[in-house]
């Protein structure tokens, strides 16, 4: 099975690119982030015409996640249990959607940005990751879950775990994505029983997944590695390869992120 994750940065602007990507890569399951539309605005028909089922979670032009699958799409959950609320009038944001696809419990995740260190959104980000980690640990724990469960937590994590996951650490001084609390919250998923398999298969430094649109960041390869896949032991054992589809940052109207693809043995 081929499982991909992609922050598409507006699915309505990039539906043709997304469908073309599915077709030319033979991807079976695609987790999307930053779809930026309500559920009823999502271009479902384009994916159905290509042979895929779709589950979406979106309220507005902000955030939004989806899962596209041609190997089943069962037991859809919008938001994870204990997902924290945010806002002046606290509400659930469209940042997590789960579904069982081909026997794997796939979660498409769009982790909060954090905005700036000390901002309420930064605290929300840390709480969001901490709560997700607790849930994910329970899914694998004997008694509350199944240690042999097939679970994949994929998406835009908005954390650069290593200094070499950004092109110039000095640029990020006092900024989000690289602070010790964020990195610790990200690393805690290892202690919950998960393996970040993109690093296992692509250990090289400066293998970025995101380049800002401004200041010629992509031509200069001034990027960030912030799109990852934490998977359960059962899925880690099946993962034979990972690719970062850098060419998707080229061409007309690309997203600022590129797909990350996992190959899972049958």
Task: Describe every region a protein language model picked out.
Residues 9, 36, 81, 112, ...:
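Catalytic metal-binding/acid-base residues of hydrolase active sites
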Residues 243-266:
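Surface polyanion/phosphate-binding segment centered on an Asp-His-Pro turn
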Residues 35-38, 42-116:
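Structured beta-strand-rich core segments of catalytic domains in phosphoester-bond hydrolases
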Residues 80-87, 111-130, 170-174:
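Surface-exposed cleft-lining segments at the edges of enzyme active sites
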Residues 61-76, 205, 217-238, 264:
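Conserved beta strand-loop-helix elements of the APE1-like EEP
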Residues 1-10, 103-118, 257:
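Active-site-proximal beta-strand elements of phosphoester/diester hydrolases
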Residues 50, 128-226:
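Metal-dependent phosphoesterases centered on the DNase I-like endonuclease/exonuclease/phosphatase
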Residues 1-56, 62-65, 161:
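N-terminal, active-site-proximal structural segment of metallo-dependent hydrolase catalytic domains
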């Amino acid at each position: 099975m081929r499982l991909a994750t992609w922050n598409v940065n507006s699915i309505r602007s990039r539906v043709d690119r997304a469908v073309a990507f599915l077709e030319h890569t033979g991807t079976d399951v695609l987790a999307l982030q930053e779809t930026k539309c309500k559920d009823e605005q999502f271009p479902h028909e384009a994916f159905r015409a290509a042979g895929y089922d779709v589950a979406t979670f979106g309220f507005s032009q902000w955030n939004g996640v989806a899962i596209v699958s041609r190997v089943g799409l069962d037991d859809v959950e919008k938001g994870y249990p204990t997902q924290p609320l945010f806002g002046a009038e606290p509400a659930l944001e469209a940042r997590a959607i789960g579904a069982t696809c081909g026997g794997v419990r796939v979660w498409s995740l769009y982790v909060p940005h954090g905005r700036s260190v000390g901002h309420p959104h930064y605290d929300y980000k840390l709480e969001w990751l901490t709560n997700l980690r607790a849930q994910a640990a329970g899914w694998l724990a004997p008694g509350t879950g199944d240690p042999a469960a097939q679970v994949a937590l994929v998406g835009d994590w908005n954390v650069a775990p290593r200094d070499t996951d950004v092109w110039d650490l000095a640029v990020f001084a006092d900024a989000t994505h690289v602070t010790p609390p964020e990195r610790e919250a990200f690393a805690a998923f290892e202690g919950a029983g998960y393996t970040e398999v993109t690093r296992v298969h692509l250990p090289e430094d400066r293998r970025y997944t995101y380049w800002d649109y401004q200041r010629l960041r992509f031509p200069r390869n001034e990027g960030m590695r912030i799109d990852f896949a934490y998977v359960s032991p059962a899925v880690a054992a099946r993962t034979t390869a990972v690719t970062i589809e850098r060419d998707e940052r080229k061409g007309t109207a690309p997203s600022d992120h590129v797909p990350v693809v996992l190959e899972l043995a049958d």
